[in-house]
Amino acid sequence: MNGTEGLNFYVPFSNKTGVVRSPFEYPQYYLAEPWQFSVLAAYMFLLIVLGFPINFLTLYVTVQHKKLRTPLNYIPLNLAVANLFMVFGGFTTTLYTSLHAYFVFGPTGCNLEGFFATLGGEIALWSLVVLAIERYVVVCKPMSNFRFGENHAIMGLALTWVMAMACAAPPLVGWSRYIPEGMQCSCGIDYYTSRQEVNNESFVIYMFVVHFTIPLVIIFFCYGQLVFTVKEAAAQQQESATTQKAEKEVTRMVIIMVVAFLICWVPYASVAFYIFTHQGSDFGPIFMTIPSFFAKSSSIYNPVIYIMMNKQLRNCMLTTLCCGRNPLGDDEASTTASKTETSQVAPA
């Protein structure tokens, strides 16, 4: 084995020379240079400085403006809540541990940090699944006489949290475990060892199939059908120009969010899958650290995409930031009708 396994950790460094120490007790400078730990700390600080204001402001503006509290906006708000979980439960912890070059909070802190990071990532993934299903139902109209309403939106929210908990909670109760990963300053699922006493391999397979592959299949199916339907409706002019424009805008926004999610999370999932299928192989700590920390940027890009592509939210946000005055004027407020119209599409 080219790594060193302990009771609650796996360090990707051979202990032939006797230099490996517990990542819960000693700095891990034998894994990387001090400046590299400083870079990680600076990156986490940047995520906190950018992630908290963007996501908090999204929630605050929605509370302030009643016209934003529509069923189709529930899931993007859910994303903001999940991102704040990651900021407070994960990023602040990792910032502190990176400054010390080891996970100073011990196994219990590792469980909490790994739980919040996994929970936030899975809520984001399942939120995109629900968004895809919502857009598919509203635009493609597979069920006639269906009107998307608040109850459906609440059911979607519940699904995201139930599925996210089904992925993040088991390692806390004995099915797999959370351990420090990469440079040992943040924690995640144990992809590195078989660990028979916690049935580690079965959990990793379950997670990859149920909480990664199946959601992506659903997303691609829904958007494949959606793109086909929008193009067909536009060609046949079956709907009003206003409705078609609204559907295209919202669809474009969600597709960009999905692509951005894949760019951030597929590298992490791919590296994790490689490590899982090549346990004991030789790889450096940076091999897992870079995809892991890159994936954390999802807490920033999702709200940015939503704000930039949702004219109504952007208009309300500018009004809030500018103390009740919108420097762009009220022209964009006219998008309210087009945005909400898609939630009450008439039967096909």
Swiss-Prot record:
Q: Which residues lie on this side of the membrane: Extracellular?
A: 1-36, 97-110, 174-202, 275-286
Q: Kindly state which keywords UniProt assigns to this record, in alphabetical order.
A: Acetylation, Cell projection, Chromophore, Disulfide bond, G-protein coupled receptor, Glycoprotein, Lipoprotein, Membrane, Metal-binding, Palmitate, Phosphoprotein, Photoreceptor protein, Receptor, Retinal protein, Sensory transduction, Transducer, Transmembrane, Transmembrane helix, Vision, Zinc
- In this UniProt entry, the residues modified to Phosphoserine are 334, 338, 343
- Residues annotated as binding Zn(2+): 201, 279
Q: List the disulfide bonds.
A: 110-187
List every position bearing N6-(retinylidene)lysine. Answer: 296
Report motif location: 'Ionic lock' involved in activated form stabilization. 134-136
Principal localization reads: membrane
Query: GO CC: one term?
Result: photoreceptor disc membrane
Q: Where are the transmembrane segments?
A: 37-61, 74-96, 111-133, 153-173, 203-224, 253-274, 287-308
List residues, modification Phosphothreonine. 335-336, 340, 342
User: Annotated site (Plays an important role in the conformation switch to the active conformation), which positions?
Assistant: 113
How does this chain sit within the bilayer? Multi-pass membrane protein
Sites where N-acetylmethionine occurs are at 1
Q: Drop me one GO molecular function for this one.
A: metal ion binding
**Lipid attachment in record (S-palmitoyl cysteine):** 322-323
Q: Spell out the InterPro entries in the cross-references.
A: GPCR_opsins (IPR050125), GPCR_Rhodpsn (IPR000276), GPCR_Rhodpsn_7TM (IPR017452), Opsin (IPR001760), Retinal_BS (IPR027430), Rhodopsin (IPR000732), Rhodopsin_N (IPR019477)
Q: Which residues lie on this side of the membrane: Cytoplasmic?
A: 62-73, 134-152, 225-252, 309-348
Pfam annotation, one family: 7tm_1
GO term, biological process aspect, one: absorption of visible light
Q: Which residues are glycosylated?
A: 2, 15
What does the UniProt PTM comment say about this protein? Answer: Phosphorylated on some or all of the serine and threonine residues present in the C-terminal region. Contains one covalently linked retinal chromophore. Upon light absorption, the covalently bound 11-cis-retinal is converted to all-trans-retinal. After hydrolysis of the Schiff base and release of the covalently bound all-trans-retinal, active rhodopsin is regenerated by binding of a fresh molecule of 11-cis-retinal.
Q: How does it assemble?
A: Homodimer. May form a complex composed of RHO, GRK1 and RCVRN in a Ca(2+)-dependent manner; RCVRN prevents the interaction between GRK1 and RHO. Interacts with GRK1. Interacts (phosphorylated form) with SAG. Interacts with GNAT1. Interacts with GNAT3. SAG and G-proteins compete for a common binding site. Interacts with PRCD; the interaction promotes PRCD stability. Forms a complex with ASAP1 and ARF4. Forms a complex with ASAP1, RAB11A, Rabin8/RAB3IP, ARF4 and RAB11FIP3; the complex regulates Golgi-to-cilia rhodopsin/RHO transport in photoreceptors.
Q: What does this protein do?
A: Photoreceptor required for image-forming vision at low light intensity. Required for photoreceptor cell viability after birth. Light-induced isomerization of 11-cis to all-trans retinal triggers a conformational change that activates signaling via G-proteins. Subsequent receptor phosphorylation mediates displacement of the bound G-protein alpha subunit by the arrestin SAG and terminates signaling.
Q: What is this protein called?
A: Rhodopsin
Question: What organism is recorded for this protein?
Answer: Globicephala melas (Long-finned pilot whale)
The gene for this chain is: RHO
